[in-house]
Amino acid sequence: MHRYRSHTCGALRDSHIDQTVRLSGWCHRIRDHGGVLFIDLRDHYGLTQCVADPDSPAFALAEKLRSEWVVRIDGKARRRPAGTENPELPTGDVEIYVTEIEVLGPAAELPLPVFGEQEYPEDIRLKYRFLDLRRENLHQNIMTRGAIVDSMRKRMKEQGFFEFQTPILTASSPEGARDFLVPSRIHPGKFYALPQAPQQYKQLLMMSGFDRYFQIAPCFRDEDPRADRLPGEFYQLDLEMSFVEQDDVFAAVEPVITGVFEEFAKGKPVTRNWPRIPFAESLRKYGTDKPDLRNPLLMQDVSEHFRGSGFKVFARMLEDSKNQVWAIPGPGGGSRAFCDRMNSWAQGEGQPGLGYIMWREGGEGAGPLANNIGPERTEAIRVQLGLKAGDAAFFVAGDPAKFWKFAGLARTRLGEELNLIDKDRFELAWIVDFPMYEYNEEDKKVDFSHNPFSMPQGGLDALNTQDPLTIKAFQYDITCNGYEIASGGIRNHRPEAMVKAFEIAGYGENDVVERFGGMYRAFQYGAPPHGGMAAGVDRIVMLLCGTNNLREISLFPMNQRAEDLLMGAPSEVAPKQLRELHIRLNLPQN
């Protein structure tokens, strides 16, 4: 018999009854029922009930066992007594009568229990992540993550993509966030950077004559903590294709993402024909560029009903042509208590309030806005929004560029409060026609709005003749249930167009050569039209595991202060190491 096991803890069935078996694993739970000990033994594969009574030669040692001790148990498989079977377990018809126990690894007192799913402070869970990972839900999430990555690889290869590994040590570049810098010992004063994405390398692969590239790529960004992103690193399904237009990328990617979602959605419906929503339309209807399409509420411009009306606050705003009034329908929200609750929520978000109209039985409007604009305008708003008695509408006004984010939050809040969001489906969509540039209010300059390597719609001619803020890019995102899960674009592969695009954003040709010299040189030697995208592995896994916390699908994540509490990173290093790197510390004063 094998030194440690003849079977795993998830393997035994009726067919093994009367066999002598050997199991090894962790003592998941130990119960004493009238002097008979029941030990639930757990390993990676499952759980088996082991029984020791006073007649067992191993009973004395069994009494000393504690939770999470690692043991080897020998015994005979037998059928559980009638009425004690556990249909929730694959091994639930069988138990092991214990004849021998060997303690392989005793455990100290546990800082958090493995049995059960009690909530514990996050810092404790991260410091003792090796215990946390033994817990059933987190353990299963990590296994699901591995299966999802396997599925991605298989489906990408079926689409004709080949897997490559691009460098981890690279050059620093202004792709968005701060780089993690790695000092060079051999070249004092110079630094490598960990890649924010394999962007330049994957484009260089297309210029090297390869046709369809992908990898599950680690990416590193020195960003301030955000609720929807783990600090430090994340993984993406990265891909690039040669001789393609936007529709070709869509045709290659949709079957992969749809297939992965359908495989792991546990029967929940998944969008088959993805809508394509222009960026501007997405802001106008949903107040976000990552809409949750499970929420049926659509915002509408109702400015005409307030222009010149008796509600002077909105009427005066509308004298400025850039201002608008948007309405968010609230079907079933036509009570004073609900409207007041929404108004209080808006004030909690830093807004002066949230105007509303309610419609009573009989169809008349109620509330301060209705009283000020009169019954005809109130009725016109009701008709435009398709509302009825018992419904409400909520209003935001001003410059849409300044209020659309809040309007989107209000739409989401209404959908949640009114129970309009179907949680049991996955709604996927393309967001297209992103603006190439945006105005940076802080720096008072035009900046790239997304990926600086995207092709402008209209090419070099658009860059030379159009107002930069009106130029659209061949840039696209995939959204699912309110999350951006992928982003990409058709690339700007002509060197003169690339230089012009960066010039508009304030970079001269010398800047381009200095920062992107390798790719710029490659553009001079025959660059094919190419495009691609990157899908966030972590977010996709998070959605498919039914959680909203990225730490619940990551092995050893950092906390929100970018600290690895298990390994003690970041840490101080020895003075000798700093001297070898020619680094002197200049720490901030407390």
Swiss-Prot record:
Its EC number is 6.1.1.23. GO terms for cellular component: cytoplasm. PROSITE patterns: AA_TRNA_LIGASE_II. It comes from the Bacteria. Pfam families: GAD, tRNA-synt_2, tRNA_anti-codon. One of its GO terms (biological process) is aspartyl-tRNA aminoacylation. Gene3D superfamilies: Bira Bifunctional Protein, Domain 2, GAD-like domain, Nucleic acid-binding proteins. Residues 199-202 are annotated as: Aspartate. Keywords: Aminoacyl-tRNA synthetase, ATP-binding, Cytoplasm, Ligase, Nucleotide-binding, Protein biosynthesis. L-aspartate binds at residues 175, 221, 450, 491. The record marks 33, 83 as: Important for tRNA non-discrimination. One of its GO terms (molecular function) is ATP binding. It is an enzyme of class 6 (ligase). It is found in: Cytoplasm. It catalyses: tRNA(Asx) + L-aspartate + ATP = L-aspartyl-tRNA(Asx) + AMP + diphosphate. ATP binds at residues 221-223, 484, 536-539. Belongs to the class-II aminoacyl-tRNA synthetase family. Type 1 subfamily. Homodimer. NCBIfam families: aspS_bact, PRK00476.1. Aspartyl-tRNA synthetase with relaxed tRNA specificity since it is able to aspartylate not only its cognate tRNA(Asp) but also tRNA(Asn). Reaction proceeds in two steps: L-aspartate is first activated by ATP to form Asp-AMP and then transferred to the acceptor end of tRNA(Asp/Asn). This is Aspartate--tRNA(Asp/Asn) ligase. It comes from Nitrobacter winogradskyi (strain ATCC 25391 / DSM 10237 / CIP 104748 / NCIMB 11846 / Nb-255). The gene is aspS.
